């Protein structure tokens, strides 16, 4: 064989992979367990703001989506949930702890419901975002509240904040770990149950907005 020629047989034996290996390659799963493929968003208005189209192995992007305004809409939704757990001063910056909490919570969700935890989390976020809120109108002297529609991005932001706040408050001075409380909060919110802190807060916000129409 001359210097410029390539041994095709030698190359092809490396290019052709076994079928079971090919099946595994190309399907990125969260924590190498949970698939994004069958997850659906049941609210058409939130499809552009709940990011599940580009699967990731870990919910960590090193602040890539914080550089520009509104870019967080493209941040994977599980990463946004994880970031929201890093609150309350003493937890600031403890990303590894937050990732472990979410991973443990997802295991618990799967054991309790036998469903894909990503689907449960997406359903919880869809159910917890308030559609209507009230804002203050007027200056100094006369201030009144006026009902306003909530944008899809703010609905997602508020839903995530309410879910993580509910889990944090439930685990405070409780024998249950925060992972267990987060799992319970997500399951109740996905069902639309009034046992969920986030659902109760959402209903309260919408009730106040309705009275100020």
Curated annotation (Swiss-Prot):
Subcellular location: Cytoplasm
Disulfide bonds: none
Domain of life: Eukaryota
Gene3D superfamilies the record matches: Ribosomal protein S7 domain (1.10.455.10)
Record keywords: Cytoplasm, Ribonucleoprotein, Ribosomal protein
Gene Ontology terms: cellular component: cytosolic small ribosomal subunit; ribosome
Predominant location: cytoplasm
GO biological process, alphabetically ordered: maturation of SSU-rRNA; ribosomal small subunit assembly; ribosomal subunit export from nucleus; translation
Family per record: Belongs to the universal ribosomal protein uS7 family.
NCBIfam families xrefs: PRK04027.1 (NF003106), uS7_euk_arch (TIGR01028)
Self-association and partners: Component of the small ribosomal subunit (SSU). Mature N.crassa ribosomes consist of a small (40S) and a large (60S) subunit. The 40S small subunit contains 1 molecule of ribosomal RNA (18S rRNA) and at least 32 different proteins. The large 60S subunit contains 3 rRNA molecules (26S, 5.8S and 5S rRNA) and at least 42 different proteins.
Functional description taken from the UniProt entry: Component of the ribosome, a large ribonucleoprotein complex responsible for the synthesis of proteins in the cell. The small ribosomal subunit (SSU) binds messenger RNAs (mRNAs) and translates the encoded message by selecting cognate aminoacyl-transfer RNA (tRNA) molecules. The large subunit (LSU) contains the ribosomal catalytic site termed the peptidyl transferase center (PTC), which catalyzes the formation of peptide bonds, thereby polymerizing the amino acids delivered by tRNAs into a polypeptide chain.
Name of the protein described by the UniProt record: Small ribosomal subunit protein uS7
């Amino acid at each position: 064989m001359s210097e410029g020629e390539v041994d095709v047989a030698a190359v092809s034996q490396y290019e052709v992979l076994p079928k079971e290996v090919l099946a595994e390659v190309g399907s990125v799963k969260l924590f190498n367990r949970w698939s994004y493929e069958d997850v659906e968003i049941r609210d058409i208005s939130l499809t552009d703001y709940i990011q599940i189209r580009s699967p990731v192995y870990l919910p960590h992007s090193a602040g890539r989506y914080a550089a520009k305004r509104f870019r967080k809409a493209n941040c994977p939704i599980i990463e946004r949930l994880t970031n929201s757990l890093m609150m309350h001063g003493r937890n600031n910056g403890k990303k590894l702890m937050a990732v472990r909490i979410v991973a443990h919570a997802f295991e618990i969700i799967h054991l309790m419901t036998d469903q894909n935890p990503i689907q449960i989390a997406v359903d919880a976020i869809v159910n917890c975002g308030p559609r209507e809120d009230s804002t203050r109108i007027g200056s100094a002297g006369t201030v009144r509240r006026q009902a306003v529609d909530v944008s899809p991005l703010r609905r997602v932001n508020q839903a995530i904040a309410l879910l993580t706040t509910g889990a944090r408050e439930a685990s405070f001075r409780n024998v249950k770990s925060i992972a267990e409380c987060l799992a319970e909060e997500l399951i109740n919110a996905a069902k639309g149950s009034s046992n969920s802190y986030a659902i109760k807060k959402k209903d309260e916000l919408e009730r106040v907005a309705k009275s100020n129409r």
